[in-house]
């Protein structure tokens, strides 16, 4: 087992502190005792669209294995990808770029033990990630140059649209340097990730994530991640190079 995995477990136990730069949200609905009413209806924008804004965090298990909730035959790798996956596991994940303070990439960034902040604007949704101090932009303009002519990047380029109260986001333009999780699930530059965001209440967010990569997987596969609202808090700065104790202790071939 890599030391990095042990460190991640420790961080997972303390990650709520990392986001709790205490700040009372004056817009949040409250119960009689002053606590945030997480069961209240979701907020809406002036145009009536569900507002996804807030600080959110999902289960760290998705960093260890993005397919943690799936059956083994739900994820079918092609022979070359299967060989790469086995090599990474045999090598104890020593070559995982995330262990060298490189970006975790998307969608892996969701599962790392640090929160993310969704900022919903009129024509763009911005997602700020505490880890690596990185971000995503979701563009709603179908003619947006970045989204239509992407250059390969760690996080890809995202285009969004609303279908009722569900936000659908399609992300392409990835490089092939990232791993989907600590287990070493691979992907190629042809990967397309489709998300379906649903916020049924003030304190709940569900995101269906579909991985479609014909160079790596025999069929698309989908995982649903449940996010909890981290109310009355704020992101704080995280600098990986100041916290990275992994490299001198990495094991493997």
Give names to the regions the model predicted.
Residues 1-5:
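Positively charged n-region of N-terminal signal peptides that target proteins for export
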Residues 9-11, 15-253:
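PEST-like low-complexity, intrinsically disordered acidic/proline/serine-rich tracts
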